């Protein structure tokens, strides 16, 4: 599935998306750059309109940012000696929501509801929250 089709699939599920820089393996600073939105103001410009999304992506393979305003996304990391999965299961015991593998190999748990403050690690080792005025990188969905 192309990135534009994946972005449209997220929009059809009701999520607002926007393009982030594409991966360019071998380019200095790629890991940081590929997670950045293509432009400032992405919180206002994010859209679920298919025509808008198609015009943004065209034939480009931009990464897909999903706006997390009106969502709470738990980011479970499994790298750099952080076992977010163990932390999550110790706290909550399982998954009860849309769960997708993140681009880095962890998991994103999508919850609708009130916005919460962004944080890193306060829920437990390897657990981060993305919410109001935040975003996560998405993967292809069907």
Features from the language model and the residues they span:
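Conserved phosphate/metal-binding and DNA-contacting active-site motifs used
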Residues: 1-142
